[in-house]
């Protein structure tokens, strides 16, 4: 009986590996440069990150770093211990050409062999990334693990049911509503300091109205600052 259980467990792990490989092989794309996201990131840093007064040598992770706009902003502010995390080869190339330190990791699992021990990180920046996780509760559990007690995380995600239908983006797996997001943060040991729903208009040059004018869409983002309130008792 024990042999049968061991075989079933092994098969489950093999399936999990295959499912992950399918997701991340089929649906990874380079974010590339975007003036809109570059500008929005600069605004986010000024509004939410600067007031935290993080030490200049704080261990900071930019999870799902894209082409490195957050890293650029923090480097301008003379932060010295910055690491970007992404699986995108194109974004890795852009970031490394700028001189940023980049790790090619899944956004949900940071290897201890590379120094990501329990309570080893001072701040996590997670802008437009959590929606790319197939299992956001696992992602948040991992962020809890590596963050020091009392440290902060910034999370920004698209809200559900927006004009641009983020749910249908090929690698958007988790478009969470406000209550679900708040509940997951609470379950994974975080205390929400600031939760804002931001609405704004966006024009996409490649999408036009019948008269040829650029069509505008209403976007809505959830912007959250949270504190690691307690470690998780996972054994």
PLM segments and residue spans:
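Conserved N-terminal segment of class I S-adenosyl-L-methionine
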Residues: 1-117, 123, 140, 219-222, ...
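Conserved S-adenosyl-L-methionine
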Residues: 190-201
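Conserved beta-strand signature within the Rossmann-like core of class I S-adenosyl-L-methionine
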Residues: 151-157
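Core SAM-dependent methyltransferase catalytic element
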Residues: 205-235
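Acceptor-substrate binding/catalytic loop of class I
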Residues: 165-180
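Short "lid" loop at the C-terminus of a central beta-strand within the Rossmann-like core
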Residues: 158-163, 175, 199-200
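A short glycine-rich, Lys/Arg-flanked "PGG" loop and its adjoining helix->strand segment in the class I
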Residues: 137-149
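A short SAM/SAH-binding and catalytic strip from SAM-dependent methyltransferases
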Residues: 123-134
């Amino acid at each position: 009986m024990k042999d049968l259980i061991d075989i079933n467990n092994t098969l489950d792990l093999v399936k999990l590996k295959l499912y992950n490989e399918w997701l991340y092989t089929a649906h990874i794309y380079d974010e590339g440069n975007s003036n809109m996201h570059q500008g929005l990131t600069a605004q986010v840093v000024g509004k939410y990150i600067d007031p935290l007064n993080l030490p200049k040598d704080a261990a900071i992770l930019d999870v799902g770093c894209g082409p490195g706009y957050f890293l650029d902003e923090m480097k301008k502010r003379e932060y010295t211990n910055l690491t970007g995390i992404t699986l995108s080869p194109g974004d890795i190339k852009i970031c490394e050409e700028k001189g940023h330190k980049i790790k090619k990791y899944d956004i949900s699992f940071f290897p201890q062999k590379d120094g990501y021990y329990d309570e080893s990180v001072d701040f996590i920046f997670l802008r437009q990334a959590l929606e790319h996780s197939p299992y956001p509760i696992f992602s948040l559990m991992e962020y809890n693990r590596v963050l020091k007690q009392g440290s902060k995380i910034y999370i920004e995600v698209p809200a559900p049911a927006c004009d641009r239908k983020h749910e249908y983006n090929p690698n958007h797996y988790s478009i969470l509503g406000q209550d679900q997001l708040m509940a997951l943060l609470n379950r994974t040991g975080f205390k929400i300091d600031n939760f804002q729903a931001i609405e704004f208009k966006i024009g996409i040059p490649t999408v036009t109205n019948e008269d040829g004018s650029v069509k505008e869409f209403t976007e809505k983002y959830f912007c959250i600052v949270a504190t690691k309130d307690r470690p998780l008792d996972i054994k």
